[in-house]
């Protein structure tokens, strides 16, 4: 199916990504970008993801994943093309660059400033992913770094923009991080953090609960150690995550490149 047409561009925030943001990002491995979405734009993205999950609009090329029977990551079923079950309880929805509304947000001017500083002119995305911890459920995501080699890439991207679609709190299973841990480098190319590294680097006194307001965006270094628990409330905890990388990045198994978001050949 064709990408969904957007009748009007998303709000263009006046925020400028400057040296202060860069210095915080370099030191801590993350930086808050503030509210990049207005209330109406936030509502529009929520409505769009609901429509996709409920099969109300075309989902060709978009993949969906439910939570497993338990709350452990190892219990997760594989991702599947299309929406095999009409439910708002999907854990994950991928390939959202194929939806016009989500693509417009991915191409936000602030994201362009960020990618130009850290990547360059020609930028692709490894994933454009909706993540959900449904009410009173969700899957425990173990400590890990987002390592490109573990994803089957020919390099390790470092630039992810994560946007809260709901308030993310300790009660709803917000992300937990170890500030500054990106400076350790890649601990395990297999993606997930080994138990001995967890014991050394993820002690309780080093961990920060990363609470975020709905509509707020965060720039996260891919090597920042992070995890999340389950949602113990009666409301969902939803987010949208985009991993940006150089357009020359390839899949080491197939040699294929990825959807271009900025620069030559970018999606319209």
What are these regions (language model features)?
Residues 113-114, 137-209, 249-257:
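Catalytic core of non-heme Fe(II) oxygenases with the double-stranded beta-helix
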Residues 207-219:
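Short acidic-glycine-tyrosine-enriched beta hairpin
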Residues 4-27, 34-143, 259-265:
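Non-heme Fe(II)-dependent double-stranded beta-helix
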Residues 127-130, 161-163, 240-244:
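A structural signal for short, well-ordered beta-strand segments
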Residues 99-104, 203-208, 228-229:
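Active-site rim elements
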Residues 39, 149, 226:
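Glycine-rich nucleotide phosphate-binding loop and flanking beta-alpha elements
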Residues 55, 59-63, 188-192, 217-219, ...:
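Non-heme Fe(II)/2-oxoglutarate
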């Amino acid at each position: 199916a064709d990408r969904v047409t957007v009748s009007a561009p998303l709000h263009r925030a006046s925020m400028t990504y400057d040296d202060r943001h860069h210095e915080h990002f370099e030191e801590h491995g993350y930086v808050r970008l503030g509210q990049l979405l207005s209330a109406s734009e936030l509502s529009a993205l929520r409505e769009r993801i609901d429509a996709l999950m409920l099969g109300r609009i075309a989902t060709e090329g978009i993949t969906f994943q439910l939570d497993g029977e338990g709350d452990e990551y190892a219990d997760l079923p594989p991702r599947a093309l299309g929406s095999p079950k009409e439910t708002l309880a999907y854990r994950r929805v991928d390939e959202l660059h194929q939806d016009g509304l989500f693509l417009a947000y991915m191409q936000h001017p602030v994201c362009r400033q960020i990618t130009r500083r850290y990547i360059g002119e020609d930028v692709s995305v490894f994933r454009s992913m909706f993540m959900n911890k449904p009410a009173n459920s969700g899957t425990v995501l173990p400590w890990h770094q987002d390592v490109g080699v573990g994803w089957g890439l020919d390099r390790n991207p470092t630039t992810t923009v994560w946007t809260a679609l709901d308030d993310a709190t300790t009660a709803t299973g917000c992300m937990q991080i170890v500030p500054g841990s990106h400076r350790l480098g890649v601990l395990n190319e297999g993606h997930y953090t080994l138990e001995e590294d967890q014991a050394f680097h993820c002690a309780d006194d080093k961990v920060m609960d990363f609470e975020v307001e709905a509509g707020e965006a965060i720039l996260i270094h891919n090597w920042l150690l992070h995890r999340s628990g389950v949602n113990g409330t009666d409301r969902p905890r939803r987010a949208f995550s985009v991993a940006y990388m150089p357009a020359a990045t390839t899949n080491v198994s197939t040699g294929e490149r990825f959807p271009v978001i900025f620069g030559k050949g970018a999606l319209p």
